[in-house]
Amino acid sequence: MGEEESTRIREWWVPRRGPRTLRLLIGLSFYPYSLMNASYVLIGSLLAPSVHFYRMAGMAVVYLLAVGVSAHSLDAMAPNRPWGEFLTRGQLEALALASLVPALAVGLFYALAYAPLLIPVGIAELFFLLAYNLELFGGAFHSDLWFAASWGFLPVIAGFVVQTDAVSIPSLAGGAFGFFTAFVEISASRPYKALKRGGGDESQVASKLESVLKGIVLAVIATAAFLLSRALFG
């Protein structure tokens, strides 16, 4: 297997041209999926009866740091090294820690200042961040269902809780939206990843899976944008 096929550099959000290291860094950010994850936080906040926009923005930054940077850095240390060896294990650990510490600090501030219910949500998210990405407990939590729960359901709940310090029926319904859209994303992502790493760029299956992935990302971001525009402009 060639160097290109041994990493995820063939996947749809990674630039096809440019310096290889830059392309891998952009790939490591998983920026469409990181924005999708942050959009769940916005959706949760915008379901609240009254929206404090600075809390919503701060919680979105928490998830961009914790998931967009830290979780993906930990995942890159997997035995199969999905992004190759362009960063050492020590560099990935430093990147994960440097992003996780401020994320935890901001989250704890919001919990102590406004929403103590964020503490159990944050503990659950920290557990999944470590258990899923490092495949702890024999990989028991490295599954599509746990991914959907931690990556789709809980961010919506966190977004709502930071506004209200409560959980409601609408927030649970929003969480269900997060869960099922995240489940679709991860269910399409795994076979797509395998096809791309196997050099199946031109296969019809890979093309269809790519369309599903792009569609689900845009659908979640568009939902957040719709709710945000409604909150801002009525």
Where are these regions (language model features)?
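Short, Lys/Arg-rich, polar N-terminal cytosolic tail immediately upstream
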Residues: 1-26
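Multi-pass membrane catalytic core of lipid/isoprenoid biosynthesis enzymes
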Residues: 23-28, 32-42, 55-65, 71-118, ...
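Long, highly hydrophobic alpha-helical transmembrane signal-anchor segments
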Residues: 23-50, 134-167
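Helix-coil boundary and interhelical linker segments in multi-pass alpha-helical membrane proteins
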Residues: 39-61, 103-121, 155-174, 226-234
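Alpha-helical transmembrane segments and their membrane-interface exit regions
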Residues: 64-71, 124-134, 153-155, 175-186
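C-terminal ends of transmembrane helices
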Residues: 70-85, 127-141, 186-194
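Intramembrane alpha-helical segments
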Residues: 90-163
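C-terminal transmembrane helix-loop-helix hairpin of multi-pass membrane proteins
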Residues: 179-234
